[in-house]
């Protein structure tokens, strides 16, 4: 009889632990990460090479390289493009703008993080400022070193970008 009580008690604790985790996740802000490519998603043949291919990694690969991101927010990712930002054009900008506006209109989404190449990051940011009207934050991040570099800066930039998106002080600023 005692053994059944212990097993039932353990099952109850496990179930409660699972419930607590679900409640904690529900309390976290929801952030949508839209990926466009760029150096932040770049890959090189060797970590010591200087040349690389922009946009080689998809959004899920980028997000999985960021430790503890799940402690900041409930993250979902979507691939918009896989290009170097020097190849950004009207078609990609319009696709991105439409998607940003659609995501910002979702009641359960608290903000957007965009991963982008640095060549045209500021042009994209300015364009999005002109075509979005939500008070929810839209943050853009890029990197100087590809994802496969010895000291890739993308994971830290993504982490810090999500931290900005989830900060209440970021609302109403773009």
Residue ranges and their predicted role:
Residues 19, 25-174:
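Active-site histidine-anchored catalytic micro-motif
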């Amino acid at each position: 009889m005692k053994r059944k009580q212990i097993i039932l008690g353990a099952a109850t604790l496990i179930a409660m632990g699972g419930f607590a985790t679900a409640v904690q996740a529900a309390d976290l802000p929801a952030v949508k990460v839209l990926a466009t490519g760029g150096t932040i998603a770049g890959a090189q043949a060797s970590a010591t090479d200087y040349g690389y291919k922009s946009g080689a990694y998809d959004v899920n690969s980028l997000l999985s390289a960021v430790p503890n991101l799940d402690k900041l927010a409930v993250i979902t990712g979507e691939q918009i493009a896989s290009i170097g930002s020097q190849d950004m054009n009207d078609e990609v900008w319009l696709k991105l703008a439409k998607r940003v506006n659609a995501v910002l209109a979702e009641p359960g989404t608290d903000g957007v993080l965009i991963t982008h190449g640095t060549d045209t990051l500021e042009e994209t940011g300015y364009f999005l400022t002109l075509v979005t009207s939500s008070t929810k934050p839209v943050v853009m991040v890029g990197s100087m070193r590809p994802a496969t570099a010895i000291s890739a800066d993308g994971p830290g930039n993504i982490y810090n970008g999500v931290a900005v998106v989830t900060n209440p002080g970021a609302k109403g600023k773009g």
